[in-house]
Amino acid sequence: WKPFPQIKKHKTKLKIGYVSPDFKNHSMESFLKPVLENHNREEFEIYAFAQLSQEDDTTLEYKSLVDHWVPTQGFTDLEMVKKIRELQIDILVDLAGHTKGNRLGVFAYKPTPISCSWWIGSGYTTGLSAIDYFLTDDVMAPPGSEHLFSETLCLLPSHAAIWQPDLQKMGSVNRLPALTKGYITFGTLTRAIRINDNVIKAWSEILKRVSNSKLIINSSDFNHYKNRRMIISKFKEYKVDSNRLEIGYQSPPWDIMRQIDIALDCFPHNSGTTLNEHLYMGNPFITLSNRPGVGKIGASLLTAIGRGEWIAVSEEEYIQKAVNLASDINKLATIRRSLRREVNQSPIMDHKGFVQKLE
């Protein structure tokens, strides 16, 4: 890439461009919308470069939250670079990483003076030297991990992102299920690709140590019978019978979350949005802090809400923390009643304060 040509023009506002294929019904919206809603419009002019083949109701909401909407579907990389330079964008923000529909090819041309990638779209480094910064925090990218990123780390204060729950859809927190059922229900709502042999082994050990407990695995990947059969067979290798498992898919997920007492995060690739949702529905989760970036998403979130005691650094500690949490039903019921309040009072819900620091 060639260095960005200096533009000799006095501007009253900095122009920020967000680039994404996900300006639609997508998990990113709960992280991005509160940012767009709280940008200081007296100092910043906000552009959305939307790589969309189809719009929906959420797209209309995004359009109302930005100053300029720029559809990019059908643009070649060079055509998009030309457009960005014509608009004199100052800071270009990638929200997709290497996920489907990304426009990293555009960033490779360095069309703006400053560019950055934010973890909410992917979680990994882009690998592009043309992108200047990676927005994260010091839990997801602790000291000593700089060499794992092609970008310079830009450590955001308190937490790497804010979050906005959909209260109308989520509803209220229910009574701890174990008080009615008489046994602990563990659960996860993650994608199947994150569930590997080590995760299944750890979950199996937890089930064996917590008498009569069950595990809910809810994911669209398990709509398919062959996938359900495959994962059941994996648990069977670790002596866990299928009657301890509830595997399937139900959407929206709130009623499933109401059946769960304790959520279990995956490793080395943590879950994402569902971790926030679990906490807001009163479900504590156990996470194993692993590789920088996607392996520390859970640790970053728990640190932000002041629940570092649910962060493990080894598989055995992960298992033991889950077992210990399940051993005191009354304490678990108290946690369920307090978690939503704890999240509301945490940095992830300080939307205005976060955006001021981001700016």
Write out the residue ranges for each language-model feature.
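A conserved nucleotide-sugar
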Residues: 43-45, 204-237
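Substrate-binding clefts and catalytic carboxylate motifs of secreted carbohydrate-active enzymes
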Residues: 187-198
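Short hydrophobic "strand-cap" motifs at the C-terminus of beta-strands
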Residues: 19, 189-191, 218, 248
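Alpha-helical solenoid repeat scaffolds of the TPR/TPR-like class and their adjacent stem/linker regions
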Residues: 1-183, 201, 232-240, 251-262, ...
